[in-house]
Structures are given as C-alpha cells and as structure tokens.
Amino acid sequence: MLILDRILGQASDPALADRLHDLSHAGQVETLSLSGSDIQRHRLRLASDRGTDCAIRLERHQQLRNGSVLMLDSQRAIVVQMQDQQYLDLQPRDAAAALELGYFAGNMHWAVRFAGDTLQILLNGPEADYLERLAPMLADGRVQRA
C-alpha cells in the first residue's frame, strides 16, 4: 500500500504542469477518482486507475481538490480527479417557497448552489432519498423540478 500524506500542489501549477505533461506522454500519470463526498475526507483508502493500492492520510488543514498532486517523482505521478457531480435542480413557486426550500436545505446540511432562480442540491446519495424528503413541497406545487 502506498501512503500519500501530503498535497504537493495542483496539476495546474506551472512548476508541476511541465513535469506532469512529460510523465503523461510516458503513460506514467495515475489518477485517483473521488466522489464529491470523498474529496472532503482526510483519510481514505482506494485504488488508482492503474490498480495501485493507496491510502490518503492528510492533516486536517489540507483539503483535496480536483487536480491535487499527491505523488510526483521521476517515474510516476498520482493526481486526484473529481468525479462528475450530480445535482437535483429545483425551482420554487414564489419567494415564500424559495425561503422555505432554502431553510429546509440548510437544516438538512445539503450543499447547494444557485443558477438563476433554480436551487441545485448536490446529490451525495440516491436522488430518491432527496425527493422523499422534499415530497410535501413537491406534492403541493411549492417547489417543482427544473
């Protein structure tokens, strides 16, 4: 098992980008594909796209991001790649429904973002679980799927 205990930088950093580019031409860049919830973790065990058994053990002040470089030497590199995130798009009927939906999403500790008048909830589990909790607002039309 390969222990990865620090973030060396981002793949977009000029100092790292050239080295990563050269290694990628040689087929020596491995990726660790992480979900939106896993990327928040500091301790995690998973396999790279090449099958390398990796254990991530970061200090609390370090935060993984898409493109975090966890290993880089003359032979290979290991880079974090964030999986596509899925969102549930909801549109409230009016301002009162928008406030209620926002309050509810906050109480549920759901990660959200806004796109115009649409509230997008980051799905960290089955969509059906979210829809079940939102059923009363969806049923009476206070909120609809966008």
UniProtKB/Swiss-Prot annotation:
State any GO BP term from the record: protein folding
Compartments where located: Cytoplasm
Q: Which UniProt keywords apply?
A: Chaperone, Cytoplasm, Nickel, Nickel insertion
Q: Which Gene3D superfamilies match?
A: Urease metallochaperone UreE, N-terminal domain (2.60.260.20)
Question: Is the keyword Cytoplasm in the record?
Answer: yes
HAMAP family, alphabetically? UreE (MF_00822)
To which protein family does this belong? Belongs to the UreE family.
Q: What is this protein called?
A: Urease accessory protein UreE 1
